[in-house]
A protein has these predicted regions:
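Contiguous transmembrane helix-bundle modules in multi-pass membrane proteins
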Residues: 1-162, 167, 249-271
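Accessory, solvent-exposed terminal regions and/or long lumenal/extracellular loops of proteins
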Residues: 134-270
Length: 271
């Protein structure tokens, strides 16, 4: 019941953030946008206890059990989660106020759920959903902390160094389509071990005259490499933006796990 109340609150916040700007524009003709700070301030403080109750809730009989009956293994896992989270947050210089509690409780849920998979009489649909949710929060946190970005103006033949990589702007291929012209840039991302080729596009449409950019993304199990380039006024120069976004694929996997848990739960009720 507690988890359901939290979920209703989170969904209400998202609904308000989506619908409120539309209503305001209709009523007052005033345009506003609701960004991440709104969601951070409302959701994160409630997300921390939500993760905690997801971890311990399935193992506690709320009416019969007392706090003293909380499993000692849970306390040990909680301490391990604190230590790992503190080391990580301290190493990467992340804000302690909200990041540390989020890391602690998402790790706690992650470890508890893995342990419970090997227990007796487990609710498999519930565990899959809880594991997926903990993986989702951890992946988002790690993505936010470890993501890297570099932007610079480059010409064909230029190369720049970013972290341990070299970004090489090799050439541009111009192709004429039916109603637009496309500029395909060829970039090589070189590091010590391998080379990655990315080919983002700039599309110049005829009527009306519009310029759009199409990013090229290379996905691996650990990170996505994202590159996009745009035309700027300086002759021969293009603005090139390269991003490394860790654990993006795990965000999608976690969403699939949450959905799978929900489907299994519905099938179980219908049996």
């Amino acid at each position: 019941l507690i988890n359901n109340l939290f979920m209703m609150f989170f969904l209400s916040v998202v609904l308000i953030g989506t619908v409120y700007p539309i209503f305001l524009e209709v009523i007052n003709n005033e345009k506003i946008s609701i960004g991440p700070p709104f969601y951070h301030k409302l959701i994160i403080p409630f997300l921390i206890p939500f993760l905690f109750f997801m971890a311990i809730g399935p193992n506690i009989k709320w009416i019969k059990d007392k706090m003293g009956k909380i499993n000692l293994k849970d306390i040990f896992i909680f301490i391990i989660s604190i230590v790992i989270s503190y080391i990580f947050v301290n190493k990467f210089g992340v804000s302690y106020l909200l990041s540390l509690p989020l890391f602690i409780f998402s790790l706690f849920l992650f470890f508890v759920t893995i342990r419970d998979f090997f227990g007796k009489n487990i609710n498999i649909s519930q565990k899959i959903s809880h594991f997926g949710f903990s993986l989702l929060i951890l992946s988002i946190l790690l993505n936010g902390v470890l993501a890297k970005e570099h932007s610079s103006n480059m010409r064909v033949g230029d190369e720049i160094k970013f972290l341990d990589k070299i970004i090489q702007f090799q050439n541009i291929e111009v192709i004429k389509k039916q109603n637009y012209q496309t500029l395909i840039g060829k970039f090589n991302i070189v590091d010590k071990n391998n080379s990655l080729s990315l080919k983002p596009e700039i599309r110049i449409y005829d009527q009306p005259e519009t310029i759009t950019s199409e990013a090229d993304i290379s996905s691996t199990i650990f990170a996505d490499n994202f590159l996009v380039f745009n035309i700027i006024k300086n002759d021969g120069f293009y603005n090139v933006r390269y991003q490394i976004k860790p654990f993006m694929i795990w965000i999608w996997i976690s969403v699939l796990l949450i959905s799978l848990g929900g489907i299994l739960s519905l099938k179980k009720k219908n049996v």
